[in-house]
Amino acid sequence: MLKTIALDAMGGDNGPKVIVPAALSILKKHPKVKLILVGKEDQLALLIPEKNRKSFGQRLEIIHASEEVGMDEPPSQALRTKKNSSMRVAINLVKEGQAHACVSAGNTGALMATARYVLKTLPGIDRPAIIAAFPTKNEREVRVLDLGANVDSTPENLYQFAVMGSILSSAAHNIRNPRIGLLNVGEEEIKGNELVKKANELFETRKTINYIGYVEGNTIFNNIADVVVCDGFVGNAVLKASEGVAQLIKQHAKEAFSEAWWTKLALLPAIPILKRLIRRVDPERYNGATFLGLNGIVVKSHGSANIKAFVCAVEEAIFQVDKNIPQLIKEEVAHILKEFENK
């Protein structure tokens, strides 16, 4: 059976000129995947070579959508007035069962508002959260949530995020009890604001997750926890700061190799090491944040993603379709709720 992914082909800073080549790359790499490009049909068709149309056949489809959601468009306006946007139509395909997942590089707020309106949240989940993977000092990634879906959260919200993050991490790394940390300004019990302290009490009271306690910002990447939980305000700051540091490392490495020839000569033995370092921290490799907790799979690509980065976002969607993440969350939450009822 083919895994079908709907792509918002008009979304993001680069739109079809990145998304169409990325789609062709995915189809070459994943023979059991079908992609639906949603957008302005005439523009999309021009970017697909005839040889690709023939070779991919029914695995590549275009569905016309006459409207686009602007990157700066207010989410409420997009939800209310852009019912035939490429974003809305792609999400509708998931709702209708014509696609297993949707990937968009479009306006984050509009995507969240539309996805939540169309797909709804899973039973027992009050709010969806944005989750993404980050590199650590070894090969195992850490997943952090919420990265910006909810600026204001309750302790119960954070607990639900922890449960969902645990399920996704378990599926990604094939581990039974992922380590869950709560992001705080220190590891001591007395530190933190009221939200974090109450969430800590809740996490310790409920024995449904492998809670290891507080995690500080400087240890997120030390492989102390498999999942780090925080509210969306803090999480988005972590995301942007991490991306900035990664870009700084790449920039310094490039500058080092653009200096005088004798500097380049001295650096020659270090080239393989620097390449590995850059690859490990490259944000493109980790592109693809998931709107976790929805009754369907929606993956958000960075708006400025290039072809390589957008391919990574689509592959995150393929992985979640393979593992049927929404169903796993639904089953685990139902099990937890039943346990609470019996107490």
From Swiss-Prot:
Signal sequence residues: none
Which superkingdom heads the taxonomic lineage of this protein's source?
Bacteria
Q: Which pathway does this chain act in?
A: Lipid metabolism; phospholipid metabolism
Compartment list:
Cytoplasm
Give the primary localization class.
Answer: cytoplasm
Which Pfam family, an example, fits this chain? Answer: FA_synthesis
**Keywords in alphabetical order:** Cytoplasm, Lipid biosynthesis, Lipid metabolism, Phospholipid biosynthesis, Phospholipid metabolism, Transferase
Instruction: Choose one Gene Ontology CC annotation of this protein and give it.
Output: cytoplasm
Mind listing the GO molecular function terms for this protein? phosphate:acyl-[acyl carrier protein] acyltransferase activity
- Catalyzes what? a fatty acyl-[ACP] + phosphate = an acyl phosphate + holo-[ACP]
GO BP terms in the entry: fatty acid biosynthetic process; phospholipid biosynthetic process
In terms of InterPro entries, this protein maps to:
FA_synthesis (IPR003664), Phospholipid_synth_PlsX-like (IPR012281)
Give EC number(s), comma-separated.
2.3.1.274
Q: Which SUPFAM superfamilies match?
A: Isocitrate/Isopropylmalate dehydrogenase-like
What NCBIfam families does this protein's entry cite?
Answer: plsX
Record text on subunit structure and interactions: Homodimer. Probably interacts with PlsY.
| Functional note | Catalyzes the reversible formation of acyl-phosphate (acyl-PO(4)) from acyl-[acyl-carrier-protein] (acyl-ACP). This enzyme utilizes acyl-ACP as fatty acyl donor, but not acyl-CoA.
Question: Which PANTHER family would you find in this protein's record?
Answer: FATTY ACID/PHOSPHOLIPID SYNTHESIS PROTEIN PLSX, PHOSPHATE ACYLTRANSFERASE
Q: Which family does it belong to?
A: Belongs to the PlsX family.
Q: What is this protein called?
A: Phosphate acyltransferase
